[in-house]
Regions:
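HAD-like aspartate-dependent phosphatase fold
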Residues: 1-121
Length: 121
């Protein structure tokens, strides 16, 4: 987490790495399932507030292109896709295979977005 000043207020900027299948949508791979609109809307809001979003998925090729296009149709954009943010690479002088993030949101772990949404209201 990094703190930045906006309008004389200290704001914490977080990097969130988000899985696609089973997280942003119902897992129907290789198809795309129904959207998790509660999470998607929260991520759109958080990005508007300055948080950085990374799509972190096993999808590749056309499946990845389709997933990104699907997200964009719902208004969700990412700062990086299956890669570290440029400023992280610059800071550490390395592009690690492990994505650097403050929070990893994935259906194969505890569902952290539920706690995140409860904090927001």
């Amino acid at each position: 987490m990094k703190e930045q000043m906006f309008a004389n207020k200290e704001v914490v900027i977080m990097i969130l790495a988000i899985d696609f299948d089973g997280t942003l949508c119902v897992d129907e791979y290789p198809n795309i399932g129904a959207p998790n609109l509660k999470l998607i809307n929260e991520l759109i809001y958080r990005r508007e507030q300055g948080d950085r979003l990374i799509l972190w998925t096993c999808r590749s090729g056309l499946d990845l292109v389709n997933a990104v296009a699907w997200c964009e149709l719902l208004g969700l954009q990412f700062d990086a896709i299956n890669d570290n943010l440029p400023e992280v690479i610059e800071e550490y002088h390395n592009n690690s295979r492990k994505i650097t993030a403050d929070v990893y949101i994935d259906d194969r772990s505890v569902k952290p977005w539920e706690a995140l949404l409860q904090k927001v209201g």
